[in-house]
Swiss-Prot record:
Gene symbol of the encoding locus: gpmI
The protein's name in its UniProt record: 2,3-bisphosphoglycerate-independent phosphoglycerate mutase
GO molecular function: manganese ion binding; phosphoglycerate mutase activity
Protein's pathway: Carbohydrate degradation; glycolysis; pyruvate from D-glyceraldehyde 3-phosphate: step 3/5
Species annotation: Parabacteroides distasonis (strain ATCC 8503 / DSM 20701 / CIP 104284 / JCM 5825 / NCTC 11152)
Homology family: Belongs to the BPG-independent phosphoglycerate mutase family.
Amino acid sequence: MSKKALLIICDGWGIGDKGKDDVIFNTPTPYWDELLKTYPASQLQASGENVGLPDGQMGNSEVGHLNIGAGRIVYQDLVKINIACRENTIMENPEIKRAYSYAKENNKQIHFMGLVSDGGVHSSLEHLLKLTDIAKEYGISKAYVHCFMDGRDTDPKSGKGFIEELENHLKTTGGKIASIIGRYYAMDRDKRWERVKEAYDLLVEGKGKQAECMVKAMEESYAEGVTDEFIKPIVHVENGKPVAVIEEGDVVIFFNYRNDRAKELTVVLTQQDMPEAGMHTIPGLQYFCMTPYDASFKGVHILFDKENVNNTLGEFLANVGKTQLHIAETEKYAHVTFFFNGGRETPFDSEERILVPSPKVATYDLKPEMSAFEVKDKLVDAINTKKFDFIVVNYANGDMVGHTGIYKAIEKAVVTIDACLHDTVEAAKANDYEVIIIADHGNADHALNEDGTPNTAHSLNPVPFVYVTANKDAKVEDGILADVAPSILHILGLKQPKEMTGKSLIK
């Protein structure tokens, strides 16, 4: 079996519950209905762990296109680290080994610093507790936690509970809380260096309100009307001296996995002296970031580096000499190029791209058609040349108009997509292309909340997989987004590379 293949991604076109909220079901779509009656169709899971996100988290366009093009589940940082902690593979991480071995062999302090909360945006309490477990396994007694309090992604007075939980855990692993400060100071991202200095002085010089009981110190802060985000520096003292400060040659692990609010503190500790602000880098620090914080940082270690997604569908087709076209309007152009190609900006050899400008309107309910018809016209022209072995197109309307929450506009968007599908698929059939129609996630399938108010978010619904083929015996199975690339290779008569762990859904 060796044909040409067209992949149509109808962005935000999920399979809804056929209730009032399901605009796709409630809007006349004669051509879409005909496709579903005529050709084999199944469902793809496009959210949560099926696309490398935390369980129950709705999919998005970036993650969706990454998985579609990669032909494998591409785990996001949080999930990747969660799996490493739960399956204990973190113990095999070479940078983890380096950090703990260095501290043990050189009798150095190891400092864990980061946001102590379960907000799940910047850090995970689970990761911190695991890091303290590893210190126990290595027999490191000089392990200290510097707690940045949240109150933005969590309740403003939830921090005391996290400190209690951490202290109870440290009773089993050893180690101590060394300091507490609000994220307002420790996690600034707007170059307010006077705030960062409050955190720096606490970490390096032990400057702050002295306390022997950290839970009591939190209670006192609340009593003064100061909540988690704004907690002033608190230093844990024993016999009148700080339990621990960061010293020359120590090990520091910054366990925030999101980079934006971890950069400034990392800069002043490791990258750049700021004498005018009274901050100097600490010599000889063994400094470990949970993920890459900034490509320009020198001399820091990264515990979980970005994966290179090799042998994506685009790269594989280029390597075997197949021609390909990636086409979309502005709003989704990065998705069918950069994300679809595994985070690569430049086109592969024999890859062509067409960008159609999105309409310049304030919100897309004002023009629900967007530039879909222009995309369709250019796409049909390209199909008629028979030049390309593989084409991927994104129709943006279901998602971008779905985000407005305006029901009538979403109806128009759905009608637009149905018309574009007709012209696109008929041209493909006339030129001997087989077609797969999918979505990257849901949106227009769930336009209302239960109380009837507009829902502007993505949905957790599965998405369609429709296989337009002349083969009357063809069947398709249910799957996940990672199964799309292997299915395209099946149409093209190519064996999928070992890096692709998805499977062809065409039987």
